[in-house]
């Protein structure tokens, strides 16, 4: 028997004869490592990567770094004379020459932002020398994501309080107002130009890359931001149970009941209006709680989506009117696909020429072409102007005798 094998046998036999108390003093070190997670697949069968958001972004004048575990701080490195806009009350600390730093309170479009519930009070920080600032939020269950805009792709910030900080001389942020049934644009901010953008979300933030030809459906309360493409996200509604919940109305009753004086007086009373208001509130509440999981957004690739793991309640994202509109629609897309550009309608001259060609070709033996027919019609409609000695102008048609 070889020497290493003998040592192994002796070691095993020695441990067997040890008393239980002696065995308790022995320890063994274990290493536990997280296995690499596999990429999930999309419903279309193709690979749909769900990865973490970039932890840093850099431009010519600034740099954003997300630090902390979990991500809880944003480090901003600014060059001289570069402006940093951050939400009021989020600036934690600043390193550099404090005498060169200027901090002012900026009010950004308060009337437009207040209508959609977007914060409009921001702190503007600038310095004559390079500085480094730390930015954070009060909530302990948030994480940060940074986005570098190079001017080729615009972004839409879907959540009202997701915009934390930004920098860039040509960066423009405009709030969008919901003028119609547009689920994805309620309380959103359109970001265009070039610069750096810092977003904050509840829980962890992840980035979803949707390739061309793929579709991805996500709950609107979990969407933080997404790239703006020719195919905007559309509301989607899953199939639900056949349970119907309707508010009783008078239109379904027979006409002789609707025309009765008692029914007319009752429908115009305050008691009836209060009862109908209560029924409508109950219906809206049931759609937000019982059928609320049916309201989703469908994204068509190519697109990039930032999603958060902890979304707010549905009533913080959608209004009661939007919930009722979507819940009343059949399952599937509540808004049709993007319509292609409308075909150019033929002008009146083209229609006239086409009709003339059909009329000429319909004859058994056409003796005139369309051009000759047009010239004949144009000639019969001509008038000749004659200037008399008295200075008068007389219009005469061809062939007309005085």
From Swiss-Prot:
Identification of the protein by name? Altered inheritance of mitochondria protein 24, mitochondrial
Q: Which family does it belong to?
A: Belongs to the AIM24 family.
Gene3D superfamilies associated with the record:
Mitochondrial biogenesis AIM24 (3.60.160.10)
Source gene? aim24
Query: What's the source species for this entry?
Result: Aspergillus flavus (strain ATCC 200026 / FGSC A1120 / IAM 13836 / NRRL 3357 / JCM 12722 / SRRC 167)
* Signal peptide interval: none
Annotated GO biological processes are:
inner mitochondrial membrane organization
List, alphabetically, the Pfam families matched: AIM24
Task: Enumerate the residue ranges of region (Disordered).
Answer: 35-54
Polar residues bias (residue ranges): 39-54
Q: Which UniProt keywords apply?
A: Mitochondrion, Transit peptide
Subcellular location, record wording = Mitochondrion
Which PANTHER family does the entry link to? ALTERED INHERITANCE OF MITOCHONDRIA PROTEIN 24, MITOCHONDRIAL (PTHR36959:SF2)
Origin superkingdom? Eukaryota
Residue interval of the organelle targeting sequence: 1-11
Instruction: Give the principal location in a single coarse category.
Output: mitochondrion
* GO CC entries: mitochondrial inner membrane
Q: Note the InterPro entries from the entry.
A: AIM24 (IPR002838), AIM24_sf (IPR036983), Trp_RNA-bd_attenuator-like_dom (IPR016031)
